[in-house]
């Protein structure tokens, strides 16, 4: 069986859109579009669209990536049995009506000239389910606690799941209002960094003292019973106001001062504290001794390295 997995903006590529920031949609921020081809569960090819169109973090529909994978597999799109799109369309204010098998098929037809009947082979996979499965299947574990966390996708910012012998049980969901990805990314502009520069914040953190702003950051979240947590800000604007009050504003070309390092350190400390709270509770509740992490927040190698220690 041939399976093609794809992720990216579910609309035809337009040559006049060179700015990744234009990919902002109600269901989320499409970025790092990609394609992957599997044959009978074995990886044949995988590549991000940015490697081919040379636009960093490109969120456009991965037409070039799809072509690359099919060429590596030596097949045409008509030979693919299942086309899995990594989002279902969300819900409520995060809903994107453009996400449907028919829409994905129409984009495939526009970009690759395939038969419109291909819609019958398109399946939509919930964003965080895709994250969770990718981590678990790649781990080789029979059973594991699986935690996903990022900005948000499909109207959810993360899942906590227990997996035993390929059977997933979702134990908790992280609402968008409590998104760790959005929380961690909120001070980027105040520190003079661009979008997708969370790695710079993480790299800056070791040079700072988290104690300087720890109390201020502790006012931004609450650790709750049963491994839950909540952000105290009622809106993203309120969160941004909180960072503005720290007096850490830096121009993109300005010098990095100790206050910027201390803010980064306090943010890193806060996210690690929240994640540790979640992991400790669900490790105890499930008895799992193995852990899988996925989603943008899991790319914080400073935090994950501490959890492994």
Segments (PLM) and residue ranges:
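Short acidic/glycine-rich loops and adjacent helix/strand connectors
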Residues: 1-309
């Amino acid at each position: 069986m041939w399976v093609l997995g794809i992720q990216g903006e579910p609309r035809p590529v337009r040559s006049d859109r060179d700015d990744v920031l234009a990919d902002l949609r109600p269901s989320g921020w499409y970025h790092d579009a990609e394609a992957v081809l599997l044959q009978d569960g074995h990886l044949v090819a995988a590549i991000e669209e940015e490697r081919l169109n040379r636009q960093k973090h490109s969120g456009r529909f991965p037409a070039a990536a799809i072509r690359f994978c099919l060429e590596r597999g030596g097949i045409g799109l008509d030979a693919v049995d299942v086309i899995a799109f990594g989002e279902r369309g969300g819900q409520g204010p995060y809903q994107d009506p453009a996400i449907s098998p028919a829409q994905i098929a129409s984009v495939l037809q526009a970009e690759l000239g395939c038969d419109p009947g291909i819609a019958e082979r398109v399946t939509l996979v919930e964003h965080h389910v895709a994250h969770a499965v990718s981590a678990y299947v790649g781990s080789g574990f029979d059973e594991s606690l699986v935690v996903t966390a990022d900005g948000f996708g499909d109207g959810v910012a993360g899942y906590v799941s227990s997996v035993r012998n390929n059977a997933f049980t979702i134990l908790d969901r992280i609402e968008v209002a409590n998104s760790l990805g959005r929380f961690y990314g909120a001070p980027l502009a105040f520190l003079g960094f661009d979008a997708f520069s969370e790695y710079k914040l993480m790299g800056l953190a070791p040079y700072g003292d988290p104690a300087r702003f720890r109390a201020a950051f502790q006012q931004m979240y609450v650790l709750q019973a049963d491994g839950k947590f909540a952000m105290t800000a009622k809106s993203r604007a309120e969160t941004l106001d909180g960072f503005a009050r720290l007096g850490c504003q830096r121009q993109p070309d300005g010098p990095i001062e100790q206050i910027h390092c201390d803010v980064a350190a306090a943010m890193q400390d806060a996210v690690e504290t929240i994640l540790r709270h979640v992991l400790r509770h669900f490790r105890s509740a499930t008895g799992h001794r193995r852990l899988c992490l996925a989603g943008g927040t899991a790319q914080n190698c400073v935090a994950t390295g501490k959890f492994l220690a």
